[in-house]
Amino acid sequence: MRKEKDCSRKKGKLIQLAILCAAILFTCTACGDKPTLKERVLSVFEEQKDMIRQKIADSDAEDKVEWDDLEGVIYINPGYINPDVVIQFECVAEGILTASIQAGFYYSPDDEPAIVGWAWNMGELVEEGDGYSCSDGTDNYYYTERICENFYYYQESN
């Protein structure tokens, strides 16, 4: 009888150990493969950059052509093509209210970094790393970095 109890305990511990190992393995694989915000945005841009550039090149300041749906883009501002203004393409929006982050890319007609989205009133951009950033002294933060000619990555958080 005692031998059966010991065997039963060992089986129970082995099952618990197997469940624990499976949970650890699942957690490691679920967290390890997720691309960064920047990688996600750059992937969307790379897949559609030729089409976006062509639409901008084919338009003029009088055009009010609506953008077709772009894969991976959730918001475009302004919603029409105008080669003379900054055009924002938001690809990621996570979180809620004061704990949110947005990221995307934008077209800059003069190939200069710009502030897009809600961060427009946070002040001047200053050099940081490979790009530029600004903050209003709170947890609101904006970062932008050149992708290629006339296109920049941006990330804003609050």
PLM regions and their residue ranges:
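A general, composition-driven signal for non-globular sequence regions
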Residues: 3-10, 42, 103, 140
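N-terminal export/targeting and maturation segments
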Residues: 31-96
